[in-house]
């Protein structure tokens, strides 16, 4: 068969511009063949090269005394946790595949991030998920589509994680109309390793053999990286072949075989085959090693016949690795992979010429300078245009509503409601390390082999980011830190997943720029370096762009098991104390702007994002963590979506205890309509607030400590009884605990199961 002629149409179909094609011609000194065009297409896609965002990502702080492997150096960052132990962790997205094939898209997202972790030499110990979908309550075709995506994604995550034995122990699920045509599936994984076990993905040692190990290559996932670098359209369902198919049982074998091999002295370098498959693993290892790699596709294990070099190189079949083996240790690889009944083949050799050279049955198919391919994609500074600041809320125009009905409606909203329908599908007790059941402020996991207790969370309120990208991103960092603090952890580091729409739209690219600035500022304030992450662009469908969603994954460490703290109230008679302001007096919208109350109860995305003071936030968190370490705190809960009323309800529901609370008011609220003042006290989303449950004998000591730290604080009430009663601005909201619990615990289940 004759080779295709490279035309302008073919170049455009591969997602390359005329200027990029001219750059390729300059690198090669000739026209590329069709296989080389495909190779450049995937490696220079946004998914692999970050060509639209790399200049922005350089704003992140990436260094610190605990950083052992920095962002961008390897497949995942690595952080020192003491006593010779370290953690490798990262967050990745599988958004586009999950929109087309939710089960396989989500499942292979889990498999991919797990491979990133064990490629570093770490044993994966747990994962988290940050998921976004359109509304699921309703009978329209869109609601049905959203439910099918939600069900498929959760089932795919559960299938892969449960089968491979890596527990999913937490995360977040957010529902909003902006995700109607484009759900988001962000997956976080963390692994544990000793310092000396850190593995590198570099092709070192000229003459060292290159081994392919793992599943055979097929045509699934063909050019998946390029698929993930364009908008979803009505025709995207035709891209179903670009969605990979995963086998968690095969990956479990691959994990164990690779860790066993890494424990020997046989490995010079190791790289998983994720996005761009064999292409990416070959050129990246060569580029990192400052060497060349030559492989012959005739030696690559294949499960389909008649595959072309183009298909073999661009396939994203799962559960595959590339290993650079120290010469003379080939038999070690053979013995281990035969033991684990996994395919393997010696497919090439490390060269000294800096080239990625691919043969097909001895015939030259690809010859490209590896560093140019892996590291020299064009970088763009996209045009941006700031959006005008949103108008403040007209509080006098907010209709008066029944506050009890509003609370029940908020508790029933799937973003706020219990995610037990999701959690019960996950075997979160695999490895017996899950110390806090899913649903509290952060996941807590005991790593017994290292005698360490880790905490992790994922956070982002996209309503905040939509209204003010920089402030919303600052709050995402602060809330992640607050969730870890409420669990008794000190902060370590951050990974992120930047989910945005089309970067060629100036207003949408401005959202990304501002969000990066906010994340970077937050990380500097909390001393949490960014260890790596993912950028996912082109998240928009015919329904429109998603709301900007810079998801934060943050990791902390709990120094003593006695410090593990949860959000549930513990005992009748305990005193409820608020660390932080009841209401931010400087908030022009009374902290109702961009709130879930305004969205869910009044049906609007409106107003200004709450303001965040890093100074106050850090003082509140430091004081609360100190109180936890002093043994004075029985429960701690971050106050976020839905405000104080929702946070109090969650602590009551978790502890199966009622509460009687009075929220302090003041003359500053008298200038507002009474119903607006009550709404602000109950449902406003002022920042830097933590609800504490304190034994009565310790209440005065806690209040004195907060006063000494010059932190706004209030004694709100007591735990006990069988109802939740909250008095605010002269009126009382009261409901039996059973009535409060029902919508919270069963809303998602009713939507999904009828």
Regions found by a protein language model. Give the residues of each.
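Glycine/proline-enriched, intrinsically flexible loops and inter-domain linkers
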Residues: 1-754
């Amino acid at each position: 068969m004759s080779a295709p002629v490279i035309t302008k149409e073919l170049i455009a179909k591969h997602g390359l511009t005329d200027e990029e094609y001219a750059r390729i011609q300059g690198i090669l000194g000739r026209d590329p063949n069709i296989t080389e065009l495909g190779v450049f297409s995937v490696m220079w896609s946004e998914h692999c090269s970050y060509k639209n965002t790399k200049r922005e990502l350089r704003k992140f702080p990436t260094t610190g005394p605990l950083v052992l492997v920095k962002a961008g150096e390897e497949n995942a960052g690595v952080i020192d946790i003491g006593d010779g132990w370290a953690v490798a962790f990262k967050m990745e997205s599988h958004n586009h595949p999950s929109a087309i094939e939710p089960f396989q898209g989500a499942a292979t997202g889990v498999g991919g991030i797990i491979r990133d972790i064990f490629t570093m030499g770490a044993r994966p110990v747990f994962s988290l998920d940050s998921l976004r979908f359109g509304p699921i309550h309703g009978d329209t075709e869109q609601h049905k589509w959203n439910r099918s995506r939600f069900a498929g994604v959760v089932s795919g995550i559960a299938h892969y994680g449960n089968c491979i034995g890596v527990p999913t122990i937490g995360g977040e699920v957010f529902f909003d109309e902006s995700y109607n045509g484009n759900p988001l599936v962000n997956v976080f994984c963390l692994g544990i390793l000793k310092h000396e076990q850190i593995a590198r993905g570099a092709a070192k040692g000229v003459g060292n053999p290159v081994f392919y190990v793992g599943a055979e290559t097929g045509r699934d996932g063909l050019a998946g990286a390029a698929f993930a670098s364009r908008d979803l359209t009505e025709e995207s369902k035709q891209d179903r072949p670009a969605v990979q198919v995963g086998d968690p049982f095969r990956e479990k074998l691959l994990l164990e075989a690779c860790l066993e091999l890494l424990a020997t002295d046989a490995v010079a370098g190791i790289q998983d085959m994720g996005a761009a498959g064999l292409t990416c693993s070959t050129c990246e290892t060569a580029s990192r090693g400052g060497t060349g790699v030559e492989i012959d596709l005739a030696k690559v294990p294949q499960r389909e016949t008649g595959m072309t070099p183009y298909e073999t190189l661009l396939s994203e079949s799962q559960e595959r690795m590339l290993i650079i083996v120290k010469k003379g240790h080939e038999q070690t690889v053979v013995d281990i992979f035969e033991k684990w009944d996994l395919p393997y083949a010696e497919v090439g050799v490390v060269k000294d010429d800096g080239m990625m050279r691919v043969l097909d049955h001895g015939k030259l198919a690809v010859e490209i300078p590896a560093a140019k391919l892996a590291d020299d994609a064009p970088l763009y500074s996209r045009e941006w245009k700031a959006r005008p600041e949103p108008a403040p809320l007209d509080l006098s125009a907010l209709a008066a509503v029944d506050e009890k009905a509003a609370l029940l409606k908020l508790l029933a909203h799937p973003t706020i409601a219990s995610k037990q329908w999701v959690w019960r599908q996950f075997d979160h007790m695999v490895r017996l390390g899950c110390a806090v059941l899913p649903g509290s402020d952060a996941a807590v996991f005991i790593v017994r082999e290292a005698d360490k207790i880790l905490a992790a969370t994922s956070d982002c309120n996209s309503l905040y980011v939509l209204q003010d990208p920089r402030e919303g991103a600052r709050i995402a960092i602060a809330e992640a830190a607050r969730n870890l603090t409420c669990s008794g952890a000190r902060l370590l580091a951050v990974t992120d997943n930047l989910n945005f729409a089309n970067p060629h739209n100036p207003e949408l690219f401005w959202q990304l720029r501002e969000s990066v600035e906010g994340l970077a500022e937050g990380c500097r304030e909390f001393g949490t370096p960014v260890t790596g992450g993912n950028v996912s662009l082109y998240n928009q469908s015919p329904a429109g762009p998603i709301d900007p969603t810079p998801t934060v994954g943050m990791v902390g460490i709990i120094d003593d098991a006695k410090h593990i703290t949860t959000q549930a109230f513990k005992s009748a008679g305990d005193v409820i104390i608020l660390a932080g302001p009841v209401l931010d007096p400087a908030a022009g919208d009374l902290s109702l702007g961009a709130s879930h109350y305004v969205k869910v109860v009044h049906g609007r995305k409106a107003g200004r994002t709450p303001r965040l003071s890093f100074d106050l936030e850090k003082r509140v968190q430091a004081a609360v963590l100190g109180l936890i370490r002093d043994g004075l705190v029985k429960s701690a809960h971050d106050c976020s979506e839905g405000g104080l009323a929702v946070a109090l309800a969650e602590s009551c529901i978790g502890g199966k205890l009622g509460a009687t609370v009075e929220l302090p008011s003041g003359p500053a609220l008298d200038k507002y309509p009474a119903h607006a003042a009550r709404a602000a006290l109950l449902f406003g989303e002022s920042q830097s607030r933590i609800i504490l449950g304190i034994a009565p004998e310790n209440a005065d000591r806690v209040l004195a400590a907060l006063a000494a730290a010059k932190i706004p604080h209030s004694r709100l009430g007591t735990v006990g009884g069988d109802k939740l009663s909250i008095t605010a601005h002269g009126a009382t909201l009261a409901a039996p605990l059973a009535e409060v619990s029902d919508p919270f615990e069963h809303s998602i289940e009713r939507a999904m199961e009828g």
